[in-house]
């Protein structure tokens, strides 16, 4: 890890003109010294049981949970993500949305 000598921000290794250099994301300063030390590595590991949820524009960014025992009307899968939104007036119950983990179908359930 390196810090920018001009502004003190953390510098990140980047590819510039085919070479790996440290570049400050705040002020743009480029450190060309010690290029051999700069290394860009991306490692993504997932266990067999772990799932990655990709939130799409039709899903809220918080409050998403996984549930089992709800049958998808499209493919019959029994696992879905769900979230709750207040879609009607405040004196009405909230609406629960589901998204199938297998086919991606989104459906709603009124309480």
UniProtKB/Swiss-Prot annotation:
InterPro entries: DNA-dir_RNA_pol-M_15_CS, Rpa12/Rpb9/Rpc10/TFS, TFS, Zn_ribbon_RPB9, Znf_TFIIS. Keywords: DNA-binding, DNA-directed RNA polymerase, Metal-binding, Transcription, Transcription regulation, Zinc, Zinc-finger. The keyword Ribosomal protein does not apply. Coiled coil: none annotated. A zinc finger (TFIIS-type) spans 68-108. Transmembrane segments: none annotated. Zn(2+) 1 binds at residues 4, 7, 24, 27. One of its GO terms (biological process) is DNA-templated transcription. SMART domains: RPOL9, ZnF_C2C2. One of its GO terms (cellular component) is DNA-directed RNA polymerase complex. It comes from the Archaea. A zinc finger (C4-type) spans 4-27. Zn(2+) 2 binds at residues 72, 75, 100, 103. GO terms for molecular function: DNA binding; DNA-directed RNA polymerase activity; zinc ion binding. Belongs to the archaeal RpoM/eukaryotic RPA12/RPB9/RPC11 RNA polymerase family. PANTHER family: DNA-DIRECTED RNA POLYMERASE, DNA-DIRECTED RNA POLYMERASE III SUBUNIT RPC10. Induces RNA cleavage activity in the RNA polymerase. In its presence, the cleavage activity of the RNA polymerase truncates the RNA back to position +15 in a stepwise manner by releasing mainly dinucleotides from the 3'-end of the nascent RNA. The truncated RNAs are able to continue elongation. Involved in transcriptional proofreading and fidelity. Misincorporation of nucleotides during elongation of transcription leads to arrested elongation complexes which are rescued by TFS-promoted removal of a dinucleotide from the 3'-end. This is Transcription factor S. It comes from Sulfolobus acidocaldarius (strain ATCC 33909 / DSM 639 / JCM 8929 / NBRC 15157 / NCIMB 11770). The gene is tfs.
């Amino acid at each position: 890890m390196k810090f920018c000598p001009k502004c003190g921000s953390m510098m990140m290794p980047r590819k510039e003109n085919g070479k790996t250099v440290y570049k400050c994301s705040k002020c743009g300063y480029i450190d060309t010294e010690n290029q051999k030390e700069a290394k860009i590595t991306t490692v993504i590991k997932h266990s067999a049981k772990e799932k990655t949820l990709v939130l799409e524009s039709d899903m809220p960014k918080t409050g998403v949970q996984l549930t089992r025992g709800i049958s998808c009307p499209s493919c019959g899968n029994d696992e879905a993500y769900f979230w709750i939104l207040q879609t009607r007036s405040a004196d009405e119950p909230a609406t629960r949305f589901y998204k199938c983990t297998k086919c991606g179908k989104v459906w709603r359930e009124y309480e």
